[in-house]
């Protein structure tokens, strides 16, 4: 269910697209909804996108598309429907497509992607695999490589020498392979997830901590599935 402001913004975008074929600017949205700042509009846009009412299109200024209205009988068209199987993560992920940077301030505000926070990841003893997102965070596309991404909250101190601390939020690019030395989300025996540095030792896979207080764990290749590679980190002070 949408809030009053979310519904008003969705209707405004829909009507403007019908009239002109071009979505309204953030300033026009702000004025139409009588808000004081564009940051409020940004949050509303993110909420509508997360709920499947609008979609952002790559490589186009003001690239907003209305997918459905609240009273529509048809379900929203999923922008990306692939899932991990089997996996530590399920559901739609934040997708970043190759893009060219915008120079216009207004356009750059629309080049933000909603990244789902899928729970906690152990940087210590592996914890049970997590599959349900708790909320989303908005990140500029320029911060991320192309691909699908998700975020995890770090629990533990086994990666502190790599600059990854307890309570950090790590941004993971979804992929099922990685290079030697990459920091990855590894799913062990389809049950436990951990954040470690990947090392290949012959036919075995070593999951290496970045803290001398922890031991490297070695597994056969059939016991470890790569769920993604670390690409960014967020820390709150």
Curated annotation (Swiss-Prot):
Residues 26-46 bind DNA. InterPro entries: LexA (IPR006200), LexA-like (IPR039418), LexA/Signal_pep-like_sf (IPR036286), LexA_DNA-bd_dom (IPR006199), LexA_repressor (IPR050077), Peptidase_S24_LexA (IPR006197), Peptidase_S24_S26A/B/C (IPR015927), WH-like_DNA-bd_sf (IPR036388). The keyword S-adenosyl-L-methionine does not apply. Its EC number is 3.4.21.88. GO terms for biological process: DNA repair; DNA replication; negative regulation of DNA-templated transcription; proteolysis; SOS response. It catalyses: Hydrolysis of Ala-|-Gly bond in repressor LexA. The record marks 123-124 as: Cleavage. GO terms for molecular function: DNA binding; serine-type endopeptidase activity. Keywords: Autocatalytic cleavage, DNA damage, DNA repair, DNA replication, DNA-binding, Hydrolase, Repressor, SOS response, Transcription, Transcription regulation. The keyword rRNA processing does not apply. The active site is at 158 (for autocatalytic cleavage activity), 196 (for autocatalytic cleavage activity). Homodimer. Belongs to the peptidase S24 family. Represses a number of genes involved in the response to DNA damage (SOS response), including recA and lexA. In the presence of single-stranded DNA, RecA interacts with LexA causing an autocatalytic cleavage which disrupts the DNA-binding part of LexA, leading to derepression of the SOS regulon and eventually DNA repair. PANTHER family: LEXA REPRESSOR (PTHR33516), LEXA REPRESSOR-RELATED (PTHR33516:SF2). This is LexA repressor.
């Amino acid at each position: 269910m949408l809030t009053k402001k979310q519904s008003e913004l969705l209707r405004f975008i829909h009507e403007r697209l019908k009239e002109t074929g071009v979505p309204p600017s953030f300033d026009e949205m702000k004025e139409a909804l009588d808000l004081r700042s564009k940051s409020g509009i940004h949050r509303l846009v993110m909420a509508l996108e997360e709920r499947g009412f609008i979609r952002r299109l790559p490589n186009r200024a003001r690239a907003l598309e209305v997918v459905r209205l609240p009273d529509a009988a048809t379900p929203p068209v999923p922008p990306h429907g692939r899932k991990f199987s089997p996996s530590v993560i399920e559901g739609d992920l934040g997708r970043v497509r190759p893009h060219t940077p915008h120079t216009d301030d207004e356009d750059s505000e629309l080049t933000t992607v909603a990244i789902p926070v899928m729970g906690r990841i152990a940087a210590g003893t592996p914890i049970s695999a997590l599959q349900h997102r708790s909320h989303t965070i908005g990140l500029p596309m320029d911060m991320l490589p192309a691909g699908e991404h998700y975020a995890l909250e770090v629990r533990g101190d086994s990666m502190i020498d790599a600059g990854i601390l307890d309570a950090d939020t790590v941004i993971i690019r979804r992929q099922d392979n990685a290079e030697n030395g990459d920091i990855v989300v590894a799913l062990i025996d389809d049950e436990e997830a951990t954040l470690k540095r990947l090392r290949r030792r012959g036919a075995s896979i070593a999951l290496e901590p970045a803290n001398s207080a922890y031991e490297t764990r070695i597994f056969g290749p059939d016991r470890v599935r790569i769920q993604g590679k670390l690409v960014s980190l967020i820390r709150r002070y």
